[in-house]
From Swiss-Prot:
Listed InterPro entries: AcCoA_carboxyl_beta, Acetyl_CoA_COase_Trfase_b_su, ClpP/crotonase-like_dom_sf, COA_CT_N, Znf-ACC
Entry function: Component of the acetyl coenzyme A carboxylase (ACC) complex. Biotin carboxylase (BC) catalyzes the carboxylation of biotin on its carrier protein (BCCP) and then the CO(2) group is transferred by the transcarboxylase to acetyl-CoA to form malonyl-CoA.
Name of the protein in question: Acetyl-coenzyme A carboxylase carboxyl transferase subunit beta
Name of a matching Pfam family: Zn_ribbon_ACC
Location of this chain's protein in the cell: Cytoplasm
Species this protein is from: Lactococcus lactis subsp. cremoris (strain SK11)
Alphabetic keyword roster: ATP-binding, Cytoplasm, Fatty acid biosynthesis, Fatty acid metabolism, Lipid biosynthesis, Lipid metabolism, Metal-binding, Nucleotide-binding, Transferase, Zinc, Zinc-finger
Pathway: Lipid metabolism; malonyl-CoA biosynthesis; malonyl-CoA from acetyl-CoA: step 1/1
Length: 288
């Protein structure tokens, strides 16, 4: 009889505990679902569609400039202009160059606004789209320069212009240079207007600060997306200044429509058709 016997063990699948753990707490990819900020429903991304509108409450999710371009412009019609203009750091603001570089790498944009020329249902127009994923689409010197150049190009070429606004206001890292863009862009809008040309602004969530106080409010026709936040100073600042409680819907697109600041509120899936119609109505047709 052997003094030592080989012990027998029951083999257990080493991955079993991991599998059981995953079954109890399955990992769901972050990009598969989205939570609506308004109704708090969890929505399957595919149900949002390319318009990114909540199917439960019609809340308009914030979208990038490239996503909006795909919704509004004719396919492959957009020709981007005035790229390669870089922001400087006039105040030597700590960390600003690094922030710009990181944001450019993350978004694939060179600045907070895309500018160029496109067609919408065959109607040619100059087009600018702000992108809130780029430092909250704050207006610095490059945003002001690109927009000014676009208005000058539209004036020379006798083109209408459409600007989609979305901004947290002036870019604090550029100080007074940023604030000067309000006057600069407004002057360019005025020259375009003096030439008898058509200008549409579409206010999207959020449009605030110096952008609201300048070119966003100067459109011949001002449209807005539903429930967009539109204003200059923040609600809390205003309440502390005037010492009054403001209405719940204060600074919402619907409030502004009721008080004459906005001409119409247009659903995102109807914007393309509405813009094409407005361009057609305001385009001169040469007599044949």
């Amino acid at each position: 009889m052997a003094l030592f016997q080989k012990k027998k063990y029951i083999k257990i699948n080493p991955n079993r505990s991991i599998i059981e753990k995953q079954a109890e707490h399955p990992e769901v990819p972050d990009e598969l679902f989205a939570k609506c900020p308004a109704c708090k429903h969890t929505i399957y991304q595919k149900d949002l569609g390319k318009n990114k509108v909540c199917p439960n409450c019609d809340y308009n999710f914030r979208i990038t400039a490239k996503e909006r371009l795909a919704i509004v412009a004719d396919k492959d019609s957009f020709v981007e202009m005035f790229t390669g203009i870089d922001s400087k750091n006039p105040l030597d603001f700590p960390g600003y160059p690094e922030k710009l570089a990181a944001t450019k790498a993350r978004t694939g944009l060179d600045e907070a606004i895309m500018t160029g020329v496109a067609t919408i249902k065959g109607q040619k127009t100059a087009l600018a789209i702000m992108d809130s994923t780029f430092i909250m689409a704050s207006m610095g010197t490059v945003v002001g320069e690109k927009l000014t150049r676009l208005f000058e190009h539209a004036t020379t070429e006798k083109l209408p212009i459409i600007v989609f606004t979305a901004s947290g206001g002036a870019r604090m890292q550029e100080g007074i240079m940023s604030l000067m863009q309000m006057a600069k862009t407004s002057a360019a809008v005025k020259r375009h207007s003096n030439a008898g040309l058509f200008y549409i602004t579409v206010l999207t969530d959020p449009t605030t600060g110096g952008v609201t106080a300048s070119f966003a409010s100067l459109g011949d026709i001002i449209l807005a997306e539903p429930q967009s936040l539109i204003g200059f100073a923040g609600r809390r600042v205003i309440e502390q200044t005037v010492r009054q409680t403001l209405p719940d819907d204060f600074q919402k697109a619907e409030f502004l429509l009721n008080h004459g600041f906005v001409d119409a509120i247009v659903k995102r899936n109807e914007l393309r058709q509405k813009l094409a119609l407005l361009l057609e109505l305001h385009t001169e047709v040469e007599n044949v």
